Structures are given as C-alpha cells and as structure tokens.
Amino acid sequence: MAKKKYKLGGEPEELKLAPFMRLLKAVHSMQEPETMTTADLEKQRRSQEALGNMAAAMSGLVWEPFELGGMDAAWMRLERPHKRRRVILYCHGGGYTSGGLGFSKVLAAKLTRATGMDVLAFDYRLAPEHPYPAAIEDGQAAWDHLMQLGFGARDVVLAGDSAGGNLALVLCLKLRSEGRMLPGALLLMSPWTDMSCSGESLTG
C-alpha cells in the first residue's frame, strides 16, 4: 500500500515503497498465520531464502558457509584484512517457523559493514517440525563453537531480530542458569519478548 508524504503548504503526494520492501511485504503477506498450511509455510521459507540471496549487498564482503555440528552456518566478513578480536553471533527472525541462512545475509551484511566485525549466522531448527527447545540448543551450539575458537564470552555481541531477539535473550538466560559467562553486549532489533502475546501493546 502506498504511503502519503506531506509537504508544508502543498498537496499530499504518494510515497511508494522501495522495490525490496515491496517484495518483503509480499513474502510476509502470503497467508494469515491462522490459515497457513504446511505448503504455504514451505513456500514462504523458499521465498525468504531467495529474497535474502537476491537482496544482500555483498560488495566488499565475504560469505563463508560451513557446517557446524550438522547445522548449516556461515561467516560474514569484510573482504579486506581486519582484526578479529570481537565477533557478532546473529540469530535470525522469522517467528521460529521461517527464515534461514539466505535471509540472514541481509542483516549480517549490514552488521558487518556497520561494525567491521565478523558475523556468525546459523540455521537453527524451525517449528513446527522442531519444537522448543530445538532452536535454543542450536543457539548454544553456535555459542559453544565461538568459545572453542578462542573467543571470550565478553568478546561476543549476541544479536537478533524479532524471534531471533527472543532466542538471544533466552540463550543469555540459559547461560546464566548454567553459571557461564554472559556476552559482552546484546543487540536486539524489535525482539519478540511476549510469547503469550498478551501484553498491552498487542491487546490495548
């Protein structure tokens, strides 16, 4: 839907969404969650992956996929030489039911460009095929991988958007409950913090 932009002393003019935002809106508007079938969900997942692979600006960046304990993962790095003393562990969004490595490229690229830091993205298992705590277990596996590489907990920025923000928070709580060191920082973008969807911001 076109937005309206107003100028002082003038008539409103239509402000159209950028092509990428139109595609993103279309992908996430394929079907209402209440009526989404398994086929609809698979279609949305494939579309997200294709959109992410198409949209991520990779100039000056290197995308390095690898396997992490049976789970797909990838590094986003600057192409030029740089110090690797700190790292970002990025948890993608998607309502715990969609999203993946291809879709992760968009924000991983932005994070690397903005900070100069390497970003580790991982393809955690999705619901409904893999219910809780599968995603948390995969998040901890990614965290443990960074520790095995020699990063200290305080060297890690734990980042996530939407459901990925929830995953980042739950991972922190799990680390704390186990008496382990917590990350140096949290970077949460519109995190899903109300899993019951009963808060005033949703019901008021």
Q: How should these model regions be labeled?
A:
Residues 31, 62-204:
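Alpha/beta-hydrolase superfamily serine-hydrolase fold, recognizing
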Residues 1-81:
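A glycine/proline-hinged amphipathic helix-loop "lid/cap" segment
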